[in-house]
């Protein structure tokens, strides 16, 4: 009976099973990990400042305008702080993970409605465990939320397009069409309101390119006409008025011109060459790179003619849906490559369409021998990596060049890491076995993805020991109350006010400037210094000053000591 129930659950709710499994595997990491200094702490600090100052549309980071991002995600961060009373990694991670699940659900509904449960589970696992998609689903960024709205917009357009295939929609179809005609601009605006111009551009450009390819240029105005742009413009007007009232003309100018035109044309940050994404995408969709690039090539391969009839073979005729996916991928890739500012995470809106193009191409052309190799190669690499890791972790072989690394990170030999290595090895060996014996693609893909999630789940057991190496929460707990706080030789420490509850002074790597401040007796307030042991080793004078002032607390590679000042 339990076996039947299990089978029925997987058959009737394949996506729910994948979502539940993914959530369980990622839950320990979401519960225990620290915030990263580069972006996550900055969003928290901005939200704290907005709450303190009562800002709604204009945001500031330590008093400086922060017009880099629209307000929607920062509202979420602020509301979570107000609701829970503190910043929670778990609560904020949910706003990345749930949009990821919504995207998978939409793509499954769009493409896999007639597929088997095993194929649906494999495709869901493939998208979820693609490197960049998985990373974006657990980090605290607005990219996954924007991607969800982009997919919703394009899915809504597709419904409208299907309803018009046989002419003007009538009856219930007309009601659905009218609803979609309102939803389309709302989804586009929400994508814009989440991340910025990319959210505004991807859906309309993709729609326009698709209709041009289908030789229906006049239909562009049907979907992207006055109504669509009027709704978007009206919502933007409300937003911009709020920005003007909250931040003034200078903030509005910063939002509309410096952050938009500046990043697109002559980026002041993240500037990369035109070909950057052609390389980045190869690792962003790993471990399914060979499979997905292969299906992309298969999909765009020139049409073949029937030698006898002189006509185009049936397998060469792409469906409108497949053509739309290709247009989304191509137009988004070219558009993003033309922008000056580039980061791998900006590619996230393409990934659902790259992944779910695979079943359409395979169903049309057949699953050929290359697909088995495309799955088997990464599975074999993971299995080999897992075997080597097990041999090292269990002491079977000794790698002398890594001895210094093991001493610095002793938790690498903890049981959770060993279990993670075993799970990675076992999962991919099973994937290879099923690939050879059953000669199917779905189960091996599911096993490769599952092994990655189980590896993350097991390795999360050492997060408490890993946190001090990539976050500042633990070292900030050692900072005493009532002192000025200074930092030296730290990476992006400006937002640790989230932890210490007061503004800090960052000296970068300028040890001389800090020593001068420390010797100034005009300010008698004690000063706590957060720095690294490496910095102390390289600067004996600083080390002597800190250790002579009292006890020095250490957490991971960081240390904190308090310097007492006295008037002469």
List PLM regions with ranges.
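Membrane-integral, polyisoprenol-dependent glycosyltransferases
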Residues: 1-371, 439, 465, 549-557
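Membrane-embedded architecture of ER/inner-membrane glycosylation machinery
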Residues: 2-4, 182, 186, 299-568
């Amino acid at each position: 009976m339990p076996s039947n129930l299990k089978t029925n659950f997987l058959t009737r709710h394949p996506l729910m099973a994948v979502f539940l499994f993914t959530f369980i595997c990622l839950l320990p990491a979401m519960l225990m990990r620290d915030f990263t200094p580069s972006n996550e702490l900055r969003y928290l600090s901005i939200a704290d400042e907005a709450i303190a100052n009562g800002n709604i549309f204009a945001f500031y980071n330590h008093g400086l305008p922060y017009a880099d991002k629209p307000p929607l995600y920062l509202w979420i961060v602020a509301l979570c702080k107000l609701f829970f009373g503190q910043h929670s990694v778990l609560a904020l991670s949910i706003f990345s993970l749930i949009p990821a699940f919504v995207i998978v659900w939409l793509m499954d509904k769009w493409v896999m409605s007639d597929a088997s449960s095993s194929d649906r589970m494999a495709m869901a696992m493939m998208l979820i465990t693609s490197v960049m998609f998985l990373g974006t689903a657990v980090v605290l960024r607005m990219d996954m939320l924007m991607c969800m709205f982009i997919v919703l917009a394009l899915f809504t357009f597709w419904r409208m397009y299907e309803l018009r295939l046989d002419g003007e929609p009538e009856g219930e179809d007309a009601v659905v069409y009218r609803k979609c005609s309102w939803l389309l601009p709302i989804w586009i605006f929400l994508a814009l309101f989440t991340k910025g111009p990319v959210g505004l551009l991807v859906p309309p450009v993709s729609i326009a390119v698709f209709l041009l390819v289908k030789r229906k240029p006049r239909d562009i105005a049907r979907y992207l006409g006055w109504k669509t742009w009027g709704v978007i413009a009206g919502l933007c007007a409300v937003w911009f008025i709020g920005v003007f009232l909250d931040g003034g003309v200078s903030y509005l100018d910063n939002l509309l011109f410096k952050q938009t035109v500046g990043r697109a044309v002559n980026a002041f940050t993240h500037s990369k060459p035109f070909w950057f994404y052609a390389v980045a995408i190869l690792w962003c969709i790993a471990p399914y790179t060979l499979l997905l690039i292969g299906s992309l090539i298969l999909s765009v391969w020139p049409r073949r003619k029937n030698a006898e009839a002189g006509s185009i073979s049936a397998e060469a005729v792409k469906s409108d849906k497949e053509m739309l996916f290709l247009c989304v991928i191509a137009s988004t890739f070219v558009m993003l490559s033309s922008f000056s500012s580039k980061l791998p995470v900006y590619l996230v809106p393409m990934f659902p369409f790259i992944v779910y193009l695979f079943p359409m191409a395979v169903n049309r052309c057949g699953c050929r021998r290359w697909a088995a190799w495309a799955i088997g190669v990464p599975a074999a690499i993971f299995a080999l990596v897992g075997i080597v890791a097990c041999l090292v972790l269990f002491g079977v072989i000794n790698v002398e060049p890594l001895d210094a690394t093991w001493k610095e990170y002793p938790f690498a030999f903890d049981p959770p890491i060993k279990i993670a290595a075993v799970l990675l090895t076992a999962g991919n060996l099973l994937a290879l076995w099923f690939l050879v014996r059953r000669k199917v693609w779905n189960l091996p893909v599911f096993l490769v993805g599952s092994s990655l999630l189980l590896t993350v789940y097991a390795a999360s057991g050492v997060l408490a020991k890993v946190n001090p190496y990539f976050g500042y929460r633990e070292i900030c707990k050692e900072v005493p109350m009532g002192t000025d706080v200074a930092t030296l030789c730290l990476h992006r420490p400006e937002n640790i006010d989230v932890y210490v509850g007061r503004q800090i002074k960052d000296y970068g790597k300028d040890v001389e400037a800090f020593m001068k401040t420390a010797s100034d007796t005009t300010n008698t307030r004690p000063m706590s210094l957060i720095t690294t042991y490496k910095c102390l080793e390289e600067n004996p004078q600083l080390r002597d000053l800190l250790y002579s002032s009292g006890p020095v607390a250490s957490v991971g590679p960081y240390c904190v000591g308090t310097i007492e000042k006295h008037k002469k």
